[in-house]
Amino acid sequence: MDLKSPNTTRISWNTGIKNLLRKNLVVFCGALRYAEKQTSDSTAAKLAHYLNSPFINLTNVSGLYDKNPKKYRSAKFIPEISHEDFLKIANKTKFHPGQHFVLDQTAAKTIEKYNIKTYILGDNLKNLDNLLNERHFVGSVIEW
């Protein structure tokens, strides 16, 4: 896997991003526009719906836990969870940009509404490569 530093370019959804997606190029982006209670998590969930694809979220922990593992040593890893149960956990966190939860509440609602299979992984790119190549990976799966 050859990963290079991206060039940052401002392009609009209608004139640029849709065309890149149609060409099957990988697109990494933050929020596509300002929307209340939405972060780049929400944008990514909406893109997964638009592309009819799974949603893979890389974050600073290895998956979903019952509480913040960076604060609590007793945090329990959750390897699999339903959309409904995940949404309940997400809604316990008060929304704010930069919040410390694996997905924001708007993204959680989107993946539940559209039944998007979602993977929560840490920032180890070898682990991501394992998932993409259908090998054993460390992370959490959210699905029905």
Regions found by a protein language model. Name each.
Residues 1-144:
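C-terminal catalytic "cap/lid" subdomain
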